[in-house]
Amino acid sequence: MKKQMILAMMASVAILAACSDDDNGSGNPGPGPAPSGVYETGLVFGEKEGSDSVYYIGNGDKHFPAPKGDYVLNASRKYKLRGWVYIEDGSTITIPAGTVIRGDKQTQAALIIERGGQIFARGTASKPIVFTSEEAPGNRRPGDWGGLILCGRASNNKGEQQIEGGPRSYHGGGSNPVDTDNSGVLSYVRVEFAGFPFQTDKEINGITFGSVGSGTTVDHLQVSYSNDDSFEWFGGSVGCKSVSYTHLRAHETDQYLV
């Protein structure tokens, strides 16, 4: 797919602490069976791993739409993201400061905020929210899991279109775009070892913004060890402040006038 990159994004500001690990590439096996467990909220369910309680977000399916609701995570819990989890129109997910979410390698995990859905991820300088690989430190590699995707209803020059990377989700407002659309808050968030290539030229990036509106708050983001672009924008009117990237394998940032 031939695209025209029109903007090299703003200078990086290394405000969040970067993770240190090996940064060699690695293959990704196909999806495995979902874990057994009891759903707690329709989105999260718990399971014992040895003496630890682990809370799974999603069931490992490539298309797991969370039942409609407002989901609030707990920073004291151990979370694993499994499969492609969709926060649909009318639903929200709130992630408190200090929460760590580990992406499952086997199911190529990704969190997708669809049009009308919202994420409220408010970290702090001392307690950032971290999305990272579930692999043990020293074994983590770029592309261990998918990444974070936000889809909105703001303007682009192609109307409604499917987001890059393979998920079912569409972005853009068609003939009635909403440039003030609000997909929530990303503040003091770190994403590590993401960037799974679903197909050639259809990669899931560290963080992808599809027609995200100006009502969305985005600041103090860091993507490290991404296998594809650290950040990618497709149209939209969102303003992003203080973004940084380290140890990348593809482009730092891409923005397309779409």
Residues of each region from the PLM?
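Extracellular beta-strand-rich solenoid/capping regions of secreted or surface-exposed proteins
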Residues: A66-K68, R82-T94, K105-G123, P137-N156, ...
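Extracellular beta-strand-rich, repetitive "passenger/adhesive" scaffolds
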Residues: L73-K80, I95-V100, G117-F131
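Conserved small/polar residues in nucleotide/adenosyl-binding loops
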Residues: T246-T253
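Feature marks extracellular polysaccharide-active and adherence modules
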Residues: P96, R102-D104, E114, R122, ...
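All-beta strand scaffolds that present successive hydrophobic residues in beta-strands
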Residues: L73, I93-I95, I119-G123, L186-V189, ...
